[in-house]
């Protein structure tokens, strides 16, 4: 079973939307996916996955032993995709030991093939709590100086905490690099961030967006597929 944490260096990078899209694509590719929302007080995944009714229990209830796994899960309209909704309390923080136990419990079953964790931007107690889940850490960034600087700092923090398999996704990529970016090409940006490139998502139309997130989902599962041609050096 693969365990993947998706996050960003700063807000505004589209992390929640991309995480939901990748979860959807994984399920469409035949994977059994559990999407875990670790962002407290937001429950964005309920809206993004068009789940109209909130469940009685959530991620915090499960970790703290107030319910069984089956009582905390929300089905979606997409076959193979299940949601563990985020906690309602805005100040809740997961304990790393309990996250580790949950991952081990799920790994011992054949119920899911992919655990996909939505982690809000930042580098603090909440992110530390998700470290045991980060078999792969996917860091979203936009191609702007501020976003790249934040992504580099966030990648350094995760690496310093012990995360090893760090990957980068560029979101809302145009055909050309911005003139004020300060980097001659995307390879230089990747060097600054310190994470391997996983995918690029273009600005604009739905079809390229779907193709890009589909490629990202496939690459996360070890499949060999080309990056979507977005950027022209």
Language-model segments: residues:
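Conserved C-terminal guanine-recognition region of P-loop GTPase G domains, centered on the G4
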Residues: 150-163
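Walker A/P-loop NTP-binding active-site region of P-loop NTPases
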Residues: 2-66, 114-119
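Well-ordered beta-strand positions
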Residues: 114, 136-139, 167, 199
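Inter-motif core of Ras-like GTPase G domains
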Residues: 110, 124-145
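Glycine-rich phosphate-binding loop used to anchor ATP phosphates in small-molecule kinases
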Residues: 106, 110-126
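P-loop/Walker-type NTP enzyme "switch/lid" segment
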Residues: 35-110, 207, 211
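C-terminal lobe/tail of nucleotide-utilizing enzymes
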Residues: 160-233
């Amino acid at each position: 079973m693969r365990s993947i944490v998706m996050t960003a260096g700063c807000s505004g990078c589209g992390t929640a939307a991309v995480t939901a899209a990748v979860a959807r694509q994984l399920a469409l590719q035949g994977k059994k996916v559990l999407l875990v929302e670790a962002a407290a007080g937001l429950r964005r995944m309920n809206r993004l996955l068009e789940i109209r009714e909130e469940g009685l229990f959530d991620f915090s209830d499960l970790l703290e032993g107030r319910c069984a796994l089956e009582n905390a899960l929300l089905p979606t309209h997409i076959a193979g995709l299940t949601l563990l909704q985020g906690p309602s309390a805005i100040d809740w923080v997961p304990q790393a030991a309990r996250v580790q136990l949950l991952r081990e419990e799920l790994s011992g079953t054949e119920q899911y093939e992919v655990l996909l964790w939505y982690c809000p931007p930042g580098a603090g107690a909440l992110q530390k709590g998700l470290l045991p889940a980060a078999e792969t850490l996917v860091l979203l960034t936009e191609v702007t100086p501020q976003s790249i600087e934040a992504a580099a700092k966030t990648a350094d923090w995760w690496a310093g905490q012990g995360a090893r398999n760090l990957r980068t996704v560029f979101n809302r990529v145009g055909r050309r690099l911005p003139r004020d970016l300060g980097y001659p090409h995307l390879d230089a940006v990747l060097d600054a961030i310190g994470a391997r490139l996983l995918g690029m998502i273009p600005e604009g139309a739905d079809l390229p967006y779907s193709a890009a997130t589909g490629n990202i989902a496939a690459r996360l599962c070890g499949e060999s597929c080309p990056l979507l041609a977005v950027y022209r050096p």
